[in-house]
Amino acid sequence: YCIGKRIFGQMPLRCTFNPIAGRESRFPNGKVGKAEEKKRVAIIGAGPAGLEAAYIAAQRGHSVEVYEATDRLCGGQLRIASSSPCKDILQHIPDFFRVQLGRLPNVKIHLNSPVTAENAASIEADTVLVCTGAEPLVPNIPGIDGANVKKAQDVLLGKAEVKGDVVICGGGQVGVETALELIERGHKITIVEMLPDLILKEELMTRIVMMKKLAAAGVNILCSHSVT
């Protein structure tokens, strides 16, 4: 992202996890100013967005409580992404936030604490930030509920058993990363993609490496095709 999307795209430097990167002139010494009014801030979701929001809010002097449904920091989309063999470096992100937030006495993190319609009213806060991430888009295809149909996130996390040859519907970043994982497990892969080519939104150098790996593994690629 920082190189392929920003620098090669002749855009200002930005970082996926450090919002101050490229904006240092606005934040002397990398710190934000203190808030004039201290508030109680509740953050729902302990992914990168929620934890960064907690860090900034606490630096400004607010009292922060973070509620996470899973048993770990970054237990949602980042955990799924970091399970890919080409993105295992992302597994260090939760440790970074754990250290940073551990230095701030005005941050409390509640794991295994999903916020629901039933218990939301019990949260006492002046401000609530919803940082709950996203769910995968499941297309309305006949047979999509079949026992042999698995979600990419379940495959990457080892929650879904995969047998035999595999057809992957979608040749974007998630589809190709899942294909690379299944190749390492010894599966024969076919990727079906609606667009004229795979991972068109991926930055150039990463795309070249991933496409070479698919070619070396003999993956069957069907572009400009739809699953119906």
Task: Please place each PLM-identified region on the residue numbering.
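Short acidic/His/Gly/Ser-rich catalytic and metal-binding motifs that mark active-site loops
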Residues: 23-26, 73-78, 138-139
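Rossmann-like dinucleotide-binding cores of NAD(P)H-dependent redox enzymes
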Residues: 63-103, 180-225
